[in-house]
């Protein structure tokens, strides 16, 4: 029994090392592991992947309803747009290091997939684990928090199509809710629906114009854009995989500071199937 337990643990470690250096595990890989074997290995944060030879197609018929389920988005590269010191230069995206590496992927996202009247393919997100709080560390030491999400995503192809294949590219926008919720209190106990209206240490300056942004909390909602480029398709199982690129705003500290653009690049996986009548 001890030998079996040791062998199972060894295989889990090996699988974790292999998947850390590859695109991700397959459904068959994870199907052989238990919760204890996956725990603390980072595998739970990885999206499933398909073989490189998966180059099939999934036909779509007009008038029929389809669903995109088990959609997983795993960001692997993070960039933050920084304003240059020289006004003559343009703002550029600077690579950052993610600090929340085990909790950065979206999973079990689902929605409607259909052919629109103009022949283009459209995906409308309905729910799932569709947000993750992430913090990125910049080279200068600044930490940039943001809420990675695809809430309310509506993405479409630019050209008419009759199938999902390796040339399919879905682009669209989504809503980015506030990083903080209404009951959050900042270090000076100020909040949106609870807490003080101003810093306790300076009550006489509570209405000062330069402190308004910090005192008056707001639930700021932003807009993001994403591109889902399909590169692998298994027509037999309905599985699809590919690369995504998303640009969205960072946290504003409930209106206390200006948001900056955050760019995420990673891999995604999903499954297309007929929708229930």
From Swiss-Prot:
Its main location: membrane. This is Photosystem II extrinsic protein O. Transmembrane segments: none annotated. The gene is psbO. It is a peripheral membrane protein. It comes from Synechococcus elongatus (strain ATCC 33912 / PCC 7942 / FACHB-805) (Anacystis nidulans R2). Residues 1-27 form the signal peptide. One of the extrinsic, lumenal subunits of photosystem II (PSII), which stabilize and protect the oxygen-evolving complex. PSII is a light-driven water plastoquinone oxidoreductase, using light energy to abstract electrons from H(2)O, generating a proton gradient subsequently used for ATP formation. Required for dimerization of PSII and for binding of PsbQ to PSII. PSII is composed of 1 copy each of membrane proteins PsbA, PsbB, PsbC, PsbD, PsbE, PsbF, PsbH, PsbI, PsbJ, PsbK, PsbL, PsbM, PsbT, PsbX, PsbY, PsbZ, Psb30/Ycf12, peripheral proteins PsbO, CyanoQ (PsbQ), PsbU, PsbV and a large number of cofactors. It forms dimeric complexes.
């Amino acid at each position: 029994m001890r030998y079996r337990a040791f062998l199972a643990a060894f295989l889990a470690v090996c699988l974790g090392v292999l998947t850390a250096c590859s695109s991700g595990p397959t459904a068959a890989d994870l199907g052989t592991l238990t919760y204890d074997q996956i725990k603390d290995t980072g595998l739970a944060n990885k999206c499933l992947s398909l073989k490189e030879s998966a180059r099939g197609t999934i036909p779509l018929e007009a008038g029929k309803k389809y669903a995109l389920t088990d959609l997983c988005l795993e960001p692997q590269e993070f960039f933050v747009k920084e304003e240059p010191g020289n006004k003559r230069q343009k703002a550029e995206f600077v690579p950052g290091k993610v600090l929340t590496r085990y909790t950065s992927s979206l999973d079990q996202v689902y929605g409607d997939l259909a052919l629109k009247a103009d022949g283009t393919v459209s995906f409308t997100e309905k729910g799932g684990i569709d947000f993750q709080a992430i913090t990125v560390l910049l080279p200068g030491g600044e930490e940039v928090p943001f809420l990675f999400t695809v809430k309310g995503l509506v993405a479409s192809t630019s050209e008419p199509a009759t199938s999902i294949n390796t040339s399919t590219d879905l682009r669209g926008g989504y809503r980015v809710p506030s990083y903080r919720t209404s009951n959050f209190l900042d270090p000076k106990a100020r909040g949106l629906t609870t807490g003080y209206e101003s810093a306790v240490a300076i009550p006489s300056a509570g209405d000062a114009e330069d402190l308004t942004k910090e005192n008056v909390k707001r639930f700021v909602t932003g807009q993001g854009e994403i591109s889902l480029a399909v590169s692998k398709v298994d027509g037999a199982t309905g599985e699809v995989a590919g690369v995504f690129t998303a640009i969205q705003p960072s946290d504003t500290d409930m209106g206390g500071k200006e948001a900056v653009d955050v760019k995420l690049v990673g891999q995604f996986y999903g499954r297309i199937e007929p929708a229930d009548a």
